[in-house]
Amino acid sequence: MTSVAVIVPFRVQVGQTREEELDEFLPYMKSYLQNEKNFNNITRFHIYVIKQYGTYGDDLKKFNRGLLLNIGFSLTNDLYNIFIFHDVDLLPSDSLSEYYSMYPKKPIHIAGCWQRYNGNRNYFGGIVSFDRKCFNIINGFPNDFWGWGGEDDALLNRCIGNKIKPYKIEDGGVLDIENGIGYELEEKLQVLRDNKEFKCLDKWERIEEDRLNWRENGLRQIHDRFKILSFETINDHTMIEVEIE
């Protein structure tokens, strides 16, 4: 039986439109996954939104995508056999639907076809599918990338270091709904140059450190790093708000 957990990291951030994106993402993805269920490609699915407490700009903690995704996996890993780590601002085209029900014998980079990054062979972010075994082998994501960027590079290094070669999808389409427009790469980079506080400022140093300490910094080390503040299920999605350290 094929059961799918879609795990979405989420944080309200000044100057961004994440709440509006979530309002568009949830009905789209529920319909998208329900179609797969109707065709008997999956037996059940659920979307888990792991919301980081606070609003950056009002507190000092930056967004920590990797830690949120590790938390989402840890709360769902006994319930499903496919885990899709999914950014809230990306909507897949119909041509990608088969990869949402395909058992990932090796990780599947569903967003590998995203036009913004399709010239970057090392890009491993956006939408990635894992099975339980592979995600545990690599100890999940690193927990110490605060701000935008780097945790997906470290995730790819963890796969390669464990002789796990991801399958990159190169045909298909992904719609970027960030801020209501489809940013091109240079536009996205300019936003980050203008708002350096959004970025992980020590990204490259942390990527190199992670090559050595990935066994001690990841999925197996999260249990004292978060506290659940609220848990609300509405139909096929659950919002879990967490305070993280």
Residue ranges and their predicted role:
Residues 5-18:
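A conserved hydrophobic helix/loop-capping motif in glycosyltransferases and polysaccharide synthases
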